[in-house]
């Protein structure tokens, strides 16, 4: 764990994501693996100065990342998930977006949706759904992607209400 000393949220997430992928593969308990892993990640993060906020991760996203990581421990889905849960700006953006999507007349159940932040350098194509103070939400074939407000000016509108952003 010395490698985690003074780690950035992204460095922490990359290492913790690989460990979590391997724990998922081993599946050490008949019951309670998810709760045990959540407690382990929270404590590991705390020990190295990171707040791991898994409340911003939907069940669908966790299941998807877990399946990908079980099939390939080096798959980046779990690291991306943990980056969203650990990097403060990403976690705040997801929390605000989830509150927005989960309230009002157009509210939808969120736990069955994959909701994530856009990765730096990623191209996002989707239908614009919502804007909060921190991000804009685009519905893509793979789920809902939160894009930082500063990057929304790069959106190029296309036919059918689609927008394409190069971040």
Language-model-derived ranges and their functions:
Residues 143-164:
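Beta-strand/loop nucleic-acid-binding surfaces
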Residues 112-134, 162-167:
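Structural detector for short beta-strands of small beta-barrel domains
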Residues 28-39, 45-60:
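Short conserved catalytic/interaction loops centered on acidic-Pro-aromatic/His motifs
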Residues 1-27:
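Helix-hairpin-helix/helix-loop-helix acidic hairpins
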Residues 17, 57-65:
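Short, conserved phosphate-binding/catalytic loop or strand-edge motifs used
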Residues 93-122:
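Short boundary/loop segments of OB/S1/cold-shock single-stranded nucleic-acid-binding domains
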Residues 63-101:
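Primarily interfacial, aromatic-capped hydrophobic alpha-helices that serve as membrane anchors
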Residues 136-141:
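SH3/SH3-like beta-barrel fold
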């Amino acid at each position: 764990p010395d490698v985690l000393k003074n780690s950035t949220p992204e460095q922490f997430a990359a290492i913790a994501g690989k460990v979590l992928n391997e724990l998922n593969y081993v599946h050490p308990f008949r019951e309670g693996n998810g709760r045990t892993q959540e407690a382990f990640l929270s404590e590991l993060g705390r020990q190295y100065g990171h707040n791991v906020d898994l409340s911003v991760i939907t069940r669908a996203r966790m299941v998807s990342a877990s399946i990908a990581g079980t099939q390939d421990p080096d798959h980046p889905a779990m690291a991306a998930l943990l980056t969203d849960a650990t990097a403060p700006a990403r976690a705040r953006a997801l929390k605000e977006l989830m509150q927005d999507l989960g309230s009002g007349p157009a509210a939808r159940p969120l736990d069955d949706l994959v909701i994530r932040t856009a990765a730096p350098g990623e191209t996002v194509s989707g239908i614009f759904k919502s804007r909060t103070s921190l991000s804009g939400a685009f519905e893509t074939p793979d789920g809902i992607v939160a894009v930082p407000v500063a990057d929304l000016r790069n959106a190029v509108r296309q036919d059918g209400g689609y927008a394409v952003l190069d971040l």
